[in-house]
Amino acid sequence: MDEELPDAVVFKDQNFSSDLLRQLNGLRQSKILTDVSICSGACEVPCHRNVLASSSPYFRAMFCSHFRESREAKVQLKGISSTTLEQVIAYVYTGEVHISAANVLPLMEAAAMLQYPRMFEACSSYLQSQLAPSNCLGLVRLAEILSCDSLKKKAREVALTYFPEVAASADLKELCVMELRDYLGDDKLCGEEEKVFEALMAWVKHDLQARWRYMQELLQQVRLQYIHPAFFHHFIASDALLQSSPACQAILEMAKKQIFSLYGPSAQDCKLWHTPPRSSYQDFLLLLGGRKDNQQTTRDVLLYSIQTGQWQSLAKLPTRLYKASAVTLHRSVYVLGGMAVREGKGLISCSVYIFSMKLNQWRMGEPMLAARYSHRSTTHRNFIFSIGGTGEGQELLGSMERYDSIRDVWESMADMPMAVLHPAVAVKDQRLYLFGGEDIMQNPVRLIQVYHISRNTWYKMETRMIKNVCAPAVVLGEKIIIVGGYTRRILAYDPQSNKFVKCADMKDRRMHHGATVMGNKLYVTGGRRLTTDCNIEDSASFDCYDPETDTWTSQGQLPHTLFDHACLTLQCIPHMTSLS
């Protein structure tokens, strides 16, 4: 008779379980067939042993084993308030519980004690939804006490993501040294190293006598090589507390070599400085100015995220600048010189504008010594070099000046051997390289001009390999890549061997384009291209070169055609900037 017949069906009442639970709760509320009272102090809640035993391993062990409680009519639960007990029993019979800021902690503790994992996770989810920089450290500790991994993970993520705000809270000063060290050393910490250092010092000074001995251990978690040199000079190097520790002094001396020396630290000192920036930093591609859609010079500033593939507009340049130059230094953007275009008139400028990604604002910087446009600029350590260009009298400039970002001053450096326009420029191994360009008669110059940075001297080398004009150069690995320049050709120059290697050609003959490096790949933007019938067209192309495979791939199109623009890589923490 138990065998299923061919025409048999299985009926399942979807509402039966919930109806049964509702009826059982009605019996409980009417005290019908109840056989035990769960008590908290003077509060007694009548229940059914079989329902409780079925709902939780805790009650199953209590009522189905030979414990005293299995025979008692009243069972006293310690550590649970009467209100919380009533809410838990109501949950057992209905599957519902109202969670609020007022009851979430006692409910969570009761759920942990009485072994109701779903209610426990519901409380955890509620707390996760309430997480903020002001409470995340406290909730990390609560999660540890309650062994709630999901809450601990989420609360720690908030603490790391919003570390500058968390560092300002009183809770940070109450961390033990192990906890603080774990936060400061975490690669996922989102915050400038200046903020990391300030948090360390605030924690130590909160209880100086007891915490001073941890200074060295904590200072080693700060990635000093990424601190702005001016901040290091003014607030760290001369700090009396750090100077009182020989071990901290040694760390600071090593940092000084990395931050201030033209050469960097010696080989034996390099171990500390191999640490990359924290993983919260991302590289973004930045386009500034240039000629847009064959119109007049634009003030637009565009940002591109490789992660999202999206373009975003940032604060416009303060004025229209024709053939200015731009660089990034210490995660700020510097726009130098150019011809300021106002009401159809051009004024050659020595002005410097500095852009803060964090504030999405421009400000004036210290002006250059000479007004120039069509010049080239590059950076090395704490310096910006502004090279050549055209002067106020439309003369071809052979001069070079250097900006010291620590002292905020410009100073004249040695003139280049031969004044050229539109060369490709890059810095590698303490040397500044100028490839090609054109002379005053617009003839291509087949020269490499090399500037020794620490000696302030130039020399030049003739080569038949060079014929580039209006081409950018970038450093990619150990090579300097010269990208086009009225040609499709891509040349990789090895400074050590003084040899060129030809790479895969671009699709078009390009000039007046931009190029930058992100993630060991070369990105080329816009420019002008020579068509097969020798016409010149503005370009909106956006291409990527992979040196590993020696291949080009299209990244789509720029928002519009663009040439004579700046193309830079800017590193920042997305949620701490105008991107958020």
Swiss-Prot record:
The keyword Repeat applies. Keywords: Kelch repeat, Repeat. CDD domains: BACK_KLHL38. Transmembrane segments: none annotated. Gene3D superfamilies: 1.25.40.420, Kelch-type beta propeller, Potassium Channel Kv1.1, Chain A. GO terms for cellular component: Cul3-RING ubiquitin ligase complex; cytoplasm. InterPro entries: BACK (IPR011705), Beta-prop_ATRN-MKLN-like (IPR056737), BTB-kelch_protein (IPR017096), BTB/POZ_dom (IPR000210), Kelch-typ_b-propeller (IPR015915), Kelch_1 (IPR006652), KLHL38_BACK (IPR030568), SKP1/BTB/POZ_sf (IPR011333). Kelch repeats lie at residues 284-331, 333-382, 383-430, 432-478, 479-520, 522-572. GO terms for molecular function: ubiquitin-like ligase-substrate adaptor activity. Residues 34-101 form the BTB domain. The keyword Repeat applies. Residues 136-237 form the BACK domain. GO terms for biological process: proteasome-mediated ubiquitin-dependent protein catabolic process. This is Kelch-like protein 38. The gene is Klhl38.
